[in-house]
């Protein structure tokens, strides 16, 4: 059974050798990238966006699924350590861009498309976070 990490169904520690697969729920457009940088980045930071884009780029466009990878390789690509990855992954989970599922030492990262600008500004949490980070 796969457990949803974001819902707190399981406590876990990420290890460098843990394997993961990425599932992308939809293909990204140039508009999505603009929304990520203009609306989400001020809230979660550029490193979280870089992690999202790096994970997205590991997915095959025709299947919306990646091959099995390990965290050590991913962290080498990103040039960060596991603690920094975990902190920024949690930011991505907090704004609904990623969900993490775990079974034993295997993870699945599910990537979600960013909300369009209209939906973003109608989301009370995201709208408030953006306002608090950018001001008026």
Segment roles from a protein language model:
Residues 113-136:
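Short, amphipathic alpha-helical interaction segments positioned at domain boundaries
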Residues 1-64, 69:
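Short recognition helix of helix-turn-helix/winged-helix DNA-binding domains
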Residues 10, 38, 50, 107-110, ...:
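Intrinsically disordered, low-complexity segments enriched in small/polar residues
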Residues 35, 102-103, 124, 132:
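Non-catalytic, interaction-prone regions of core transcription and DNA-replication machinery
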Residues 4, 23, 102-113:
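Alpha-helical propensity feature that highlights long, continuous alpha-helices across diverse contexts
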Residues 53, 61, 86, 102, ...:
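General N-terminal targeting signals
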Residues 58-109:
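Winged helix-turn-helix DNA-binding recognition segment
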């Amino acid at each position: 059974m796969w457990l949803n990490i974001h819902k707190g169904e399981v406590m876990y520690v990420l290890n460098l050798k843990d394997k993961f697969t990425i599932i992308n729920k939809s293909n990204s457009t140039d508009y999505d990238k603009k929304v990520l940088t203009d609306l989400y980045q001020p809230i979660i930071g550029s490193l979280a966006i870089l992690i999202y884009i790096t994970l997205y780029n590991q997915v095959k466009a025709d299947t919306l699924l990646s091959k099995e990878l390990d965290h050590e390789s991913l962290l080498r690509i990103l040039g960060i350590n596991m603690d920094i990855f975990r902190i920024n992954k949690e930011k991505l989970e907090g704004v609904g861009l990623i969900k993490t599922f775990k079974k034993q030492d295997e993870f699945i990262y599910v990537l979600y498309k960013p909300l369009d600008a209209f939906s973003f500004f109608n989301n009370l949490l995201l709208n408030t976070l953006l306002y608090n980070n950018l001001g008026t």
